[in-house]
Amino acid sequence: VILDVRHQDDFSKGHIPQSIFIGIDGDFAPWVGSLILDIKQPILLVTPVGREEESITRLARVGYDNTLGYLKGGFESWKNEGKEYDTVNWVTADTLEELMAEKVPVFDVRKEGEYAAEHIEGVPSTPLNSINDHIEEFPKEEEFYVHCAGGYRSVIAASILKARGYHNIINAIGGFTSIKKTAIKTTNYVCPSTLKS
């Protein structure tokens, strides 16, 4: 697997096709453990320049010690050599608000507890940690939109779905935090401590 650990904005602007994003400056270890199930999985890294060794060490600390190497010179060297690269399309929360009037498909990849506390009305819960169980729910042809709380997990979801051939995915940047500032209808907030587990 090609694992890209740069910032989600950098990954969105350009990445090696079929690479998976899990940013080193987010909840890196938990998401690696959750999404790369085989700890013996060979890994090729794309890192921010100068953070190659840190990335290898942090993977090894959680048991992933089969890192084959990293892209020398980072993603820019790949791009500068004229090699093919992919991007993640995105919209702002304000644009999503306009699109919601057209009943576009939107998916919430936050944890079930976050979704239960508050979510966009009519939008299904497809949590990132079980995204493989929801693959069939995503449209094959029609453009669809994903969001999380702030924009990190939705890019992970986009990378997984793009690697599986879903190039019609669009990320809502800023996530639910930005969506809350629009007129998009959300459910009434329920304090997570009052939710039954």
Please report, for each region that a protein language model flagged, where it lies by residue.
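Hard-cation-handling environments
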Residues: 1
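Phosphate-rich cofactor/ligand-interacting catalytic cores and adjacent structured alpha/beta frameworks
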Residues: 4
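Rhodanese-like catalytic fold shared by cysteine-dependent sulfurtransferases
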Residues: 8-197
